[in-house]
Amino acid sequence: MAGEKTKRIACFSCLHAPITHKGYFDWLLGQIEGYKPHYIVNLGDWYEGKHAKRWAKHKSENWDALTEHRAVATQARAINQASKGAKRIWLYGNHDCNTFNPHPDRLEDDVIRALHWEENKDTSAALAHWSVVQSYGHDVYKRLGPITFAHGVDLSESGIKRETVYYSTPYGLRVSGHTHRPTELAQLDLNRALLPYYNINPGCGADWDKMPYVKRQDKQRWGRGLVLIEACGVDQSRTAYASKQWDAEVRIHSMADERF
């Protein structure tokens, strides 16, 4: 990338407000301030969306929808302050979509309209200069040049590889969240043949000790992190590239199992 104009991108996922890990969020702000990104990308599940869940609430989930709005607004203002001059993007994750988009097994449409973040003055003001992708699915993504951003749907390694090939570009990078598993930059392979596709995952930003519904899950590989990218041509739209025109790394704040 020598001699070419590059842009810096900072990307995180799964804050699950209001149960965001405070130590992680403070660390995140410091990382953003130090990196001075041109773009901020939030891969989704910004809201926990407790009131849109289909199952019984745990006694520890004792907050209301306004608490989630206040938490997101507070976080958005802090990110805005830490990333002055940056363009900011939020893609809906499954929790956000369940909360704010019509679904037959979730909230009634009139309740969604009343509780939508755009109807909350505090949240809508804090997010006024964010570009928001208000949909979610395996084929929903945001692309900045050779970098493809998505919340992600599949949790399996094979499914993540499939989504990478389907929706990113040759010699491009796919950045996704959803799994809560931070992963280093990896190049896809097929029967030991390397493919020109790459992926990376920042992990999550939630305090999983406050997630009773994941208590029985194997969280050994769960962690909190941030993906930092430097890329050429992020303001251009191309469907394929002849070579890798970016660099990326994941920085880890903490892991569920600190032996890893």
Where are these regions (language model features)?
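Beta-strand-turn-beta hairpins that frame and shape the catalytic cleft
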Residues: 1-10, 141-148
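A short C-terminal boundary segment appended to hydrolase-like catalytic domains
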Residues: 230-260
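Acidic carboxylate-rich catalytic motifs and surrounding loops in phosphoryl-/glycosyl-chemistry enzymes
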Residues: 87-95, 134-138, 239-245
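Core catalytic region of metal-dependent phosphoesterases/phosphodiesterases
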Residues: 8, 12, 17-125
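Conserved beta-sheet core of the metallophosphoesterase superfamily
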Residues: 147-242
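A generic local structural motif
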Residues: 26-29, 76-77, 135-141, 159-164
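Metallo-beta-lactamase
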Residues: 111-146
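Short gly/ser/thr-rich secondary-structure transition/capping motifs
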Residues: 22-23, 130-132, 156-159
